Every structure is written in structure tokens, then in C-alpha cells.
Design a protein with these regions (language model features):
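N-terminal cap/lid segment of alpha/beta-hydrolase-fold proteins
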Residues: 1-25
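Short beta-strand element of the alpha/beta-hydrolase
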Residues: 25-35
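The serine-hydrolase catalytic nucleophile loop
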Residues: 36-48
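Alpha/beta-hydrolase active-site loop
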Residues: 78-102
């Protein structure tokens, strides 16, 4: 069994999934990023599968996506690269918030994603040598 919730973290709303009963227990953690024009809620099946495997999962919405979507679909298309770059920049704050919550077991933090989220994960790995695993 797992638990899944939306909550405030690092100044924004994230989807947070974890094995049931382990909300406050340090676990290996995956920050998972969704694709362009999508949201963490649409990609929540990744959170379910990873939490069932024993991971803590944190899924933020990219700028102008999900809970952060302001309604400008046409403009968003023209801001793809800015959105991708901001997504990568926000990782530092998100990682610090995850550490402050004492959610990491032995510093085991991975990043992953699909589509634009995969590009985000790869970009984070090139800039954050402390991240040892990506998917």
C-alpha cells in the first residue's frame, strides 16, 4: 500500500508519494518530472509504481503547467526552452526542501522524467554531481 498527497514544498505544490506508514521515515527519493503541456497529476502513475517499490517520490509541476498553469496555451509553446531551464533551476530549492524534511535515506536522491521531464532530469544530472542516478 502507498500514500499519495499534494502538498506545499519549496514554495510550490508537489505530488508526494511514499509507502504507507513511512511519511516521516527517510527513504531513497526520486524527483520525477512530467512532460510538456502535462502535469504531475497526469504522470502520477509513475509515483504510484515507484512508491510501491519503496521509494519516496516528489513530482513538481513545471512552470506554466498543472497547478501553475495560467491559461496561455499558445504562449507556453513559445516559452518551451525558458520553462525547461526554469524547471532545472528550481531543482536546487526543491532538493534543499527535501533534505530539510529529512526525507532522504543516506543522501539517495535520483531524478527522472518523461519527454520534457526526461530532458529536465538529464539537465539536472549535468549540473548536480551529487545526483548519482537518473531515469
Amino acid at each position: 500500500m502507498i500514500a499519495i498527497e499534494t502538498r506545499q514544498l519549496a514554495g510550490g505544490v508537489v505530488l508526494h508519494a511514499f509507502p504507507e506508514g513511512k511519511r516521516a521515515v527517510p527513504l531513497p527519493c526520486v524527483v520525477f518530472y512530467h512532460g510538456f503541456t502535462s502535469s504531475s497529476l497526469v504522470y502520477s502513475y509513475f509515483a504510484v509504481a515507484l512508491a510501491q517499490a519503496g521509494f519516496r517520490v516528489v513530482m513538481p509541476d513545471a512552470p506554466e503547467h498543472g497547478a501553475r498553469f495560467g491559461g496561455d496555451s499558445q504562449g507556453r509553446i513559445h516559452r518551451f526552452w525558458q520553462i525547461l531551464h526554469q524547471n532545472m533551476q528550481e531543482f536546487t530549492t526543491l532538493r534543499a526542501a527535501i533534505q530539510a524534511e529529512n526525507w532522504l535515506l543516506d543522501g539517495r536522491l535520483a531524478v527522472g522524467g518523461a519527454s520534457m521531464g526526461g530532458m529536465t532530469a538529464l539537465g539536472i544530472m549535468t549540473r548536480h554531481r551529487e545526483v548519482k542516478c537518473g531515469a
